[in-house]
Amino acid sequence: DSVAAEATRDCLQRELKNCGIETLGWRVVPTENSVCGEQALAAMPCIEQIFVAAEKPIAENEFERALFLARRRAEKYFPEFAYVVSLSNHTIGYKAMVLPENMPAFYPDLAREDLASRVVLFHQRFSTNTAPAWERAQPFRFLAHNGEINTIEGNRLWSVARGAAWKSPLIDFSELKPLVSLHGSDSQSLDNMLEALLAGGMDLLCAMRILVPPATSVLESRDPDLAAFYQYFGLNCDPWDGPAGI
């Protein structure tokens, strides 16, 4: 849908501009659609990459946070089915609703030597509690998840109810309402929560310990301080329980 694609570009560029970020250009990502199945081909999205730069010198972590805010603001006005795979100064995400062995064929970029990366995270899984969709392909922006979050409905509701409890001098969490996706996959919602905590300045390991804690009864006899850490943060963040692997 060319109209929806143009509306998505305009919306994202506007919010980037509001965050002090200049749009340098857009690129249509080359794809080999013949490797797609019938269902994937019927839902095939327009896949483009945006290139941006800060309008003035800015610290690396501040730039990443500005990109996050611009994306979250823009998402509120996106047409249906528009989705940002990644908007980062660290990583580039490639998603596809294809068999894993067909990823390099679907994205010729992945075979280009000039696009080689020092680190690559690859993940595949089949949908269990949600219907397959392009935007639900793994990995997400900060995590790859295999399994099910058995407490997902409660986690989503508590993120709405307790969202006001999260405070940071770096970000206004009220801008992010709803804090997590209420309709996507469980992995997607967990990824939303993780990136919000990171944008607020929390350390990655600290954030993961808060979201996916062990049973505190196991810790109390070993490390009372660590048990107190989990109990404190548990007041405003229920465990995302049930993941097989993250």
Q: Which residue stretches match the model-derived regions?
A:
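Conserved short alpha-helical segments that host acidic/polar catalytic motifs at enzyme active sites
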Residues: D1-I246
